[in-house]
Design a protein with these regions (language model features):
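Phosphate/nucleotide-binding beta-alpha loop and adjacent structural elements of enzyme active sites
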Residues: 1-230
Length: 230
């Protein structure tokens, strides 16, 4: 039964999934949306429309493990591979997977890029507001070094056919560099407040050039969905 709090007091339940109560991560708006079964609502609806049996899902921006747990528990996928830059979220994502009996998910503390290396990742409170960029008005925000993995090598190794991406504005730089032609579907949360209309056009053009078309039934507001065929 979906509801605010697990009977044992250790979890919040959302859409049938269990999320350990961690006051450093599950708080404020995130907690409220989870309890109301409304967390990542647009992405959830898109994923349930396009993810199919046997899919290999690549997720960029693992967050609290919500989307990876959703696709692994609601659809008989082959596997889901999540890449999350924030090292403080990795243990929690694994807790969520374990709590929900997910055994076909892999979590990596890294981001993808055109070549291997490292990058500065700026950690904020709340954690889900952390990003690769210094925000306007910030002065010397705390940061950690995060590994950058070669995107083409990762795609070649995992061979995903579905991409789910929410990387806080970094999509405008990363998406055009990804080998998207092997994908059947993609779900992308855009951040127009940071990347502007030119950035949105750049991202959409990259998917269209790879043979994916805008899928209106899975798209809503800032969440864009693409498929090779409807």
């Amino acid at each position: 039964m979906d509801g605010p709090i697990d009977a044992q007091g250790g979890f919040i339940r959302s859409r049938g999934m269990k999320f350990p109560k961690n006051p450093e991560i599950i708080k404020g708006r995130v907690r409220k949306l989870l309890r109301g079964n409304a967390y990542e609502d647009k992405e959830t609806n898109a994923a349930l429309r396009v993810v199919r049996e046997g899919d290999v899902v690549l997720e960029l921006g693992g967050g609290i493990g919500y989307m990876s747990t959703l696709v692994a528990t609601k659809r008989p996928i082959k596997s889901v591979h999540s890449f999350e830059a924030n090292p403080h979220l990795i243990p929690y994502i694994r807790e969520v997977h374990a709590a929900n009996g997910v055994r076909n998910a892999e979590v990596t503390n890294a981001i993808l890029g055109p070549r291997k290396g490292t990058a500065d990742f700026y950690v904020r409170d709340p954690m889900l507001g952390s990003s690769l960029e210094v925000l306007e008005g910030e002065v010397d925000p705390p940061s950690v070094k995060v590994d950058v993995l070669n995107a083409k090598a990762v795609f070649k190794d995992i061979k995903p056919n579905v991409l789910i991406c929410d990387i806080e504005g970094a999509e405008v730089d990363l998406i055009p560099q990804l080998p998207l032609k092997g994908l059947r579907a993609a779900i992308l949360e855009t951040h127009p407040q940071w990347i502007g209309p030119e950035g949105i056009n750049t991202v959409m053009r990259a998917f269209m050039d790879a043979g994916l078309a805008y899928y209106h039934r899975g798209s809503h507001g800032k969440v864009l969905c693409f498929r090779t065929e409807w």
